[in-house]
Swiss-Prot record:
Binding annotation for NADP(+): G165, R166, S167, S190, I231
HAMAP family associated with the record: THF_DHG_CYH
A Pfam family reported for this protein in Swiss-Prot or TrEMBL: THF_DHG_CYH
Function, in words: Catalyzes the oxidation of 5,10-methylenetetrahydrofolate to 5,10-methenyltetrahydrofolate and then the hydrolysis of 5,10-methenyltetrahydrofolate to 10-formyltetrahydrofolate.
Catalytic activity: (6R)-5,10-methylene-5,6,7,8-tetrahydrofolate + NADP(+) = (6R)-5,10-methenyltetrahydrofolate + NADPH; (6R)-5,10-methenyltetrahydrofolate + H2O = (6R)-10-formyltetrahydrofolate + H(+)
Protein name: Bifunctional protein FolD
Example of a GO MF term: methenyltetrahydrofolate cyclohydrolase activity
Transmembrane segments: none
NCBIfam families: PRK10792.1, PRK14186.1
Length: 279
């Protein structure tokens, strides 16, 4: 069998059309959703991400502001900028592009953003609300994974979901979202002893470890749904954490890289910004 490919690009385009009409309705009420993005330093990957976020905002009519600060910026200067944006009524969402230079504490920055403008869903208050299943801004990549599964009519309730990876940005929250949808969830990570034994039990396998082609067909149960969140560059080409060619022969559904989860991440950021503007 060959897996059904979950096309994140096509789904993102469809969702963005829906979001565009929501923006139009908000504008009719005199509200233009506004997103502020702060970029500290000039990390090439971060610069690319920030540009694509701005372009996506433009396409659907969200007002976006990019604040570029030098790599030498102090933590105090960055926190002052966040305070200013917290108090700016034209800005509904604030995003600080990670990673930050070493003199700045990421946690201090995340906690300084007003929870009402935390469109990345990283503030401890947002995370806590997600844990107890309350309405909140969900982290964009896990939110994108959830929407992809729902749109593909993949049943989550009662299924065994195995998450490989435990980062605060993807691994931990995506497992929590699956638990909120009534799945049984197992986390694996670098200290997990019997990885293959556990991943082979997964009905839904979500991989986010940042290691190229780390998961191959030997890790996957026949008919499992495999979501590849990784993005790695090997010999100048992008690839995921899953060995696409071998896994597509055993999985029932599989996300490609590029064109899988990636386009959904920015789409959910747009959705969160619109939600913030409504509130």
């Amino acid at each position: 069998m060959s897996a059904v490919l979950l096309d994140g690009k096509a789904l993102a385009a469809k969702k963005r059309d829906e979001l565009k009409s929501e923006v139009t309705k908000l504008k009719e009420r005199g509200i233009t959703p506004g997103l502020a993005v702060i970029l500290v330093g000039n990390d090439p990957a971060s610069t690319v991400y920030v540009r694509s976020k701005q372009k996506a905002c433009e396409q659907i009519g969200i007002y976006s502001v990019l604040k570029e600060l030098p790599a030498s910026t102090s933590e105090e200067e960055l926190l002052t900028e966040i305070d200013r944006l917290n108090n700016d009524p034209t800005i509904h969402g604030i995003l600080v592009q990670l990673p930050l230079p070493e003199q700045i504490s990421e946690q201090a920055v995340i906690e300084r953003i007003s929870p009402a403008k935390d469109v990345d869903g990283f503030h401890p208050i947002s995370v806590g609300r997600m844990m107890i299943g309350e309405d909140t801004f969900l982290p964009c990549t896990p939110f994108g994974v959830l929407v992809m599964l729902q749109e593909a009519n993949v049943e989550i309730a009662g299924k065994h979901v195995v998450v490989v990876g435990r980062s605060n940005i993807v691994g931990k929250p995506v497992g929590q979202l699956m638990l909120n949808e009534h799945a049984t969830v197992t986390y694996c990570h670098s200290r997990t002893k019997n990885l293959t034994e556990i991943t082979k039990q997964a009905d839904i396998l979500i991989v986010a470890v940042g290691r190229a082609r780390f998961i191959d067909a030997s890790h996957v149960k026949e008919g499992a749904v495999v979501i590849d969140v990784g993005i790695n560059r090997v010999d100048g080409k992008l690839c995921g954490d899953v060995d696409f060619e071998s896994v597509r022969e055993v999985a029932s559904h599989l996300t490609p890289v590029p064109g899988g989860v990636g386009p959904m991440t920015i789409t959910m950021l747009l959705a969160n910004t619109i939600q913030a503007a409504k509130e």
